[in-house]
Amino acid sequence: MARAPKPRIATPRRVRLLVATRKGLWTLTGDAARRSWKLAGPQFLGHIVHHAVADPRDGRTILAAARTGHLGPTVFRSTDSGKSWKEAQQPPAFAKKADGSGRVVDHTFWLTPGHASERDS
């Protein structure tokens, strides 16, 4: 009985590591063998970045959850692998009660890109 061929797994040409810190966001990009690395950043210098994640649906979009010193929590989005960033139009927020009261978001500690079947918007 012949064995089925092993599936081929694509080896990435580069590896990207997003490092979120209390001082900003750094990006390390390395070759597939992880022997050579380039450091870029910081992005959002002086702001606390709680989480950063690349969207696997396109490989270019990055989301970053940050807490700016005076404006509070926000989410930034890059569609060019971190070369430029756009801040969300509205900060993260809980739904308000009918009387206008409600809880306040202190920080966003985790972001999850949409499912592979969902459109990017």
Regions found by a protein language model. Give the residues of each.
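Extracellular glycan-interacting surfaces
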Residues: 1-121
